[in-house]
UniProtKB/Swiss-Prot annotation:
Disulfide bonds join C403-C1047. Glycans are attached at N92, N136, N184, N323, N347, N593, N769, N876, N973. Residues 252-429 form the VWFA domain. This is Voltage-dependent calcium channel subunit alpha-2/delta-1. One of its GO terms (molecular function) is metal ion binding. The chain crosses the membrane at residues 1062-1082. It comes from the Eukaryota. It comes from Rattus norvegicus (Rat). Belongs to the calcium channel subunit alpha-2/delta family. The modification Phosphoserine is found at S119. Residues 1-24 form the signal peptide. InterPro entries: Ca_channel_alpha-2/delta (IPR051173), VDCC_a2/dsu (IPR013680), VWA_N (IPR013608), VWF_A (IPR002035), vWFA_dom_sf (IPR036465). Binds gabapentin, an antiepileptic drug. The alpha-2/delta subunit of voltage-dependent calcium channels regulates calcium current density and activation/inactivation kinetics of the calcium channel. Plays an important role in excitation-contraction coupling.
């Protein structure tokens, strides 16, 4: 009985699948649908193969083997050579640093401090003179130089090699005795700057960052008014990561915040801001956490131990600090017990160097001696204390805490003292480095960051400069323990890239380098989008690629300094980040000795183990093409586009005197004119690059002349194209090339790189533009890599393809899918059917073809936005898999700023949120001025001036760094057919799915979504803003890293009796007034142009 019921139920379900709910006509059988798909596939592949000439181009390469050789890409040899070249480059820069540091110490030791200077005695060029042309008068005791500048291609700006420039922060009085003395003795560095450049003309910026100024060479205006007029300069070299890194060893820091009831109002706001500023003095080599205390102590965030001080973790801590509230009573014992126990927890990843507690409080009577006696008897943990706000507490107890624990005591009575007093602790941490002498003289290399003087992405080598005044020749008499400053030398990433040539590796081969934190120095996906970001560019290798267990292993071995090689199959994200392909890659890595970036790797796909090298012969460059009509180089001239097809060449550095240009026509003319004047064998040229592009020009021209031009117009084909490794792109006919939108640099072209990784014909969806014309009008791109075996060696030197007219494709498709006879509406895919949706998607889930006109206008759109429920079901049945990836280099509009109405784009039109936020700054500034007026009468040396943070005012004016997430879809497996019911609760939709062999396409036939309303929530693929992975979870399993090899955190000779107090502060009250009145003016409605 039970078996009979089960059989009846099965038959009923089967019949309901065959007969759709909206029609009595049966749904086409899988066999029928497959026959349609097979016919479509055959027609498409035949069309693409015939029209593109993929076989013919392969024949041309094989026919003319005498014009080139096949050379090996020996991965081990290539990576070793590149590693040694990078090592040599950084070593040369390090030598320049050492010369500068030695001279600086020598000159300063001989310098006689002076209280007075004669008028115009100190001569220098102030880099900020051009910021205010009407205010170029010199301060008392100094005289300004007026350099003659020339435009320099290496720096991309106005330069004078005859002088150095000086930048003095806005909060520093240029005429002060300290500044005049620093200007005086650092002027001797100019000659060393020049000698360094004479020895190595490729040197870029050389900088000495002292306490109150930065001297850099060559001289250049700080701001180019022609590019960024009316910009307020708020730069301070002391806040730059490279200066902070060079001034002290890594830190384990616990910030302890008093949140008792007495800490309220303005004091609490000052503490919040002070903690945020303190966090900005930390780099990725440091570890930190923030705890609050009153009668109890607790972490302010989800972090329960020290965490790496990276950008994301610091943001979590800043957000948490901004939410703390004040209540209860102060118990220093509870607070310090909590701080010491967390700071001394060695079971977590940490810096294992300077151990620091930073106490922010409004003061108190308790000293907590027994806690220090218990946890810090040997004084291995430094305690810095900050008395914040105006109050009547005795400063003695918290000053005692600092003095007893080798720290320093600071007072922050107002906003004006925050910036300077939250960075002064670096001088204390620098004492052991000075006392260590030459042992501490080790060049360190920074993370990648954007140069303040618009040099682009750079790394900086740093070396501390010590005050050796009074030191004996044998360095046993150490009378001084102060750091004078940090010396820096920049290295452009472009210079390093030139040592890792890529144009023989094929577009999917690349080098990358990482540091001990796992951050990349080189990687094709290292592309920060925020040109104004002050943060270092810290992109982890596992975030630059699609992570898997093998890559984690490779990263760990590289950090450990091992050499190795591994071949495996991996997921590869496309250049345009819309697709994911699967490909075999071989990773080969080796150490780079003597640098922080000690690890270099080369990644090669299997088809780039060999490459084509054109023979270096005059006959190649000047011979006529095999057709005999014109020289190979002449086929690149715009005058010959009608005959040879519209031609693009990759904008590469073929010769030193031939600069790449984004204007293809201009570049082609310059290229041909150069070739006519000079042979490619000219010493200033890259002979291999030029010969290869000329070789490809001849081969592709022969394809056009002997094949494409002889074919009759093929219906449905809008264009044909060929793209080569050598950098040639030809589009035929000429008219089609005039609308060509692909990247002329073939190594950065998404469809080209995808074609190499796929053996099939790759159909590429155009970009969907909601507000623009239909994307389908440009045609559907179909491409195929040319595959060769020359002497048994696999090569893929080019990609050919066509663009298909969508309307012709739809017409052929509907004819293919019509059944005869067909009495009902369900039996086929007739155009604009009311009950049947027939679509073709690519492997990324993008729409390429449909039987509905309203779908046709959405060609190129992700199917999850068109039929969300069906797309979700395609994932559920394992047709598609997906990968969610994060981009940590994105920029977004400020989240708090809504779209504004009319008004000049450069003017600040604040939102309510902005007004509330900045309102506090205005209020606090007003209070600060009143406090300082009163305090100056009693304590004229109490306060320190400060530069205000640029981001406080400009964050809402431009893009902000942010995290975005994007989901890429791809075929999960090789299964060809899927059938079933899409259940929508009250109704269902029958569907059948069939992949098209030898392509990246899939055909879907499904009952119309209009016949069965279902879940309409869009499934998004496009990039969206995101919070990224939860940092609270990430810190529980931190990625493997190694800190610096050396640590200078304690020295028995250290004199720590200088531990702070108001007597040590030397303010510039009028600087504070000026800055804060400017602040009030800015936030009170002035339409000041900040950029």
């Amino acid at each position: 009985m039970a078996a009979g019921c089960l059989l009846a139920l099965t038959l009923t379900l089967f019949q309901s699948w065959l007969i759709g709910p909206s029609s009595e006509e049966p749904f086409p059988s899988p066999v029928t649908i497959k026959s349609w798909v097979d016919k479509m596939q055959e027609d498409l592949v035949t069309l693409a193969k015939t029209a593109s000439g993929v076989t013919q181009l392969a024949d041309i390469y094989e026919k003319y083997q005498d014009l080139y050789t096949v050379e090996p890409n020996n991965a081990r040899q290539l990576v070793e050579i590149a590693a040694r070249d990078i090592e040599k480059l950084l070593s040369n820069r390090s030598k320049a640093l050492v010369r500068l540091a030695m001279e600086a110490e020598k000159v300063q030791a001989a310098h006689q401090w002076r209280e007075d200077f004669a008028s115009n005695e100190v001569v220098y060029y102030n880099a900020k003179d051009d910021l205010d042309p009407e205010r170029n008068e010199s301060e008392s005791g100094s005289q300004r130089i007026k350099p003659v500048f020339i435009e320099d291609a290496n720096f991309g700006r106005q330069i004078s090699y005859q002088h150095a420039a000086v930048h003095i922060p806005t909060d520093i009085y240029e005429g002060s005795t300290i500044v005049l003395n620093e200007l005086n003795w650092t002027s001797a560095l100019d000659e060393v700057f020049k000698r360094n450049r004479d020895e190595d003309p490729t040197l870029l910026w050389q900088v000495f960052a002292a306490d109150r100024l930065a001297r850099y060479y060559p001289a250049s205006p700080w701001v180019d008014n022609s590019r960024t007029p009316n910009k307020i300069d708020l730069y301070d070299v002391r806040r730059r990561p490279w200066y902070i890194q060079g001034a002290a060893s890594p830190k384990d820091m616990l910030i302890l915040v008093d949140v008792s009831g007495s800490v309220s109002g303005l004091t609490l706001k000052l503490i919040r801001t002070s903690v945020s500023e303190m966090l900005e003095t930390l780099s990725d080599d440091d570890f930190v956490n923030v705890a609050s205390f009153n009668s109890n102590a607790q972490d302010v965030s989800c972090f329960q131990h020290l965490v790496q001080a990276n950008v994301r973790n610091k943001k979590v801590l800043k957000d948490a600090v901004n939410n703390i509230t004040a209540k209860g009573i102060t118990d220093y014992k509870k607070g310090f017990t909590f701080a010491f126990e967390q700071l001394l927890n060695y079971n977590v990843s940490r810096a294992n160097c300077n151990k620091i507690i930073m106490l922010f409080t409004d003061g108190g009577e308790e000293r907590a001696q027994e806690i220090f006696a218990k946890y810090n008897k040997d004084k291995k943990v430094r305690v810095f204390t900050f008395s914040v706000g105006q109050h009547n507490y005795d400063r003695g107890p918290i000053q005692w805490m600092a003095c007893e624990n080798k720290g320093y005591y600071y007072e922050i009575p107002s906003i004006g003292a925050i910036r300077i007093n939250t960075q002064e602790y670096l001088d204390v941490l620098g004492r052991p480095m000075v006392l260590a002498g030459d042992k501490a003289k080790q060049v360190q290399w920074t993370n990648v960051y954007l140069d303040a003087l618009e040099l682009g992405l750079v790394i900086t080598g740093t070396l501390p400069v010590f005050n050796v005044t009074g030191q004996s020749e044998n360095k046993t008499n150490l009378k001084n323990q102060l750091i004078l400053g940090v010396m820096g030398v920049d290295v452009s990433l472009e210079d390093i890239k030139r040592l890792t040539p890529r144009f023989t590796l094929c577009p999917n081969g690349y080098y990358f380098a990482i540091d001990p934190n796992g951050y990349v120095l080189l990687h094709p996906n290292l592309q920060p989008k925020n040109p104004k970001s002050q943060e270092p560019v810290t992109l982890d290798f596992l975030d630059a690629e699609l992570e898997n267990d093998i890559k984690v292993e490779i990263r760990n071995k590289m950090i450990d300094g091992e050499s190795g090689e591994k071949t495996f199959r991996t997921l590869v994200k496309s250049q345009d980040e819309r697709y994911i392909d699967k490909g075999n890659r071989t990773y080969t890595w080796t150490p780079v000795n003597g640098t922080d970036y000690r690890y270099l790797a080369l990644v090669l796909p299997t088809y780039s183990f060999y490459y084509i090298k054109a023979k270096i012969e005059e006959t190649i460059t000047q011979a006529r093409s095999k057709k005999g009509k014109m020289k190979d180089s002449e086929t690149l001239k715009p005058d010959n586009f009608e005959e040879s097809g519209y031609t693009f060449i990759a904008p590469r550095e073929y010769c030193n005197d031939l600069k790449p240009s984004d204007n293809n026509t201009e570049f082609l003319l310059n290229f041909n004119e150069f070739i006519d004047r000079k042979t490619p064998n000219n010493p200033s040229c890259n002979t291999d690059l030029i010969n290869r592009i000329l070789l490809d020009a001849g081969f592709t021209n022969e394809l056009v002349q002997n094949y494409w031009s002889k074919q009759k117009n093929i219906k449905g084909v809008k264009a044909r194209f060929v793209v080569t490794d050598g950098g040639i792109t030809r589009v035929y006919p000429k008219e089609a090339g005039e609308n060509w939108q692909e990247n002329p640099e073939t190594y950065e072209d998404s469809f080209y790189k995808r074609s190499l990784d796929n053996d099939n014909y790759v159909f590429t969806a155009p970009y969907f533009n909601k507000s623009g014309p239909g994307a389908y009008e440009s045609g559907i791109m179909v491409s195929k890599a040319v595959e060769l075996y020359i002497q048994g060696k696999l090569l893929k030197p080019a990609v050919v393809g066509i663009k298909i007219d969508v309307n012709s494709w739809i017409e052929n498709f509907t004819k293919t899918s019509i059944r005869d006879p067909c009495a009902g509406p369900v039996c086929d895919c007739k155009r604009n059917s009311d009950v049947m949706d027939c679509v073709i998607l690519d492997d990324g889930g993008f729409l390429l073809m449909a039987n509905h006109d309203d779908y046709t206008n959405q060609i190129g759109r992700f199917f999850g936005e068109i039929d969300p429920r069906m797309m979700r079901h395609l994932v559920n049945i394992s047709l598609y898999a997906f990968n969610k990836s994060y981009d940590y280099q994105s920029v977004c509009d400020p989240g708090a700023a809504p779209k504004q109405g009319a008004g000049h784009r450069s003017a600040y039109v604040p939102s309510i949120t902005d007004i509330l936020q900045i309102g506090w700054w205005a209020t606090a500034a007003a209070w600060s001025i009143l406090q300082q007026l009163l305090l100056s009468l009693t304590f004229p040396r109490l306060l320190e001036a400060v530069e205000m943070e640029e981001d406080d005012f400009t964050a809402s004016l431009s893009k902000q760094s942010c995290i975005t997430e994007q989901t890429q879809y791809f075929f999960k497996n090789d299964t060809k057919s899927f059938s079933g019911l899409l259940d929508c609760g009250n109704c269902s939709r029958i569907f059948h799915v069939e992949k098209l062999m030898n392509t990246n396409l899939v055909f879907i036939m499904v009952e119309s979504k209009g016949t069965c309303p279902c879940d309409t929530r869009l499934l998004m693929q496009a990039e969206q803003t995101s919070d990224g992975p939860d940092p609270c979870d990430m810190v529980k399993q931190p990625r493997y890293r190694k800190g610096p090899d050396v640590c200078f955190d304690n020295n028995v000779l250290e004199d720590y009796t200088d531990c702070g107090g108001v007597s040590g502060l030397n303010p510039s009250l009028w600087s504070i007034f000026g800055l804060q009145f400017i602040l009030l003016w800015l936030v009170s409605g002035s339409r000041h142009y900040l950029w």
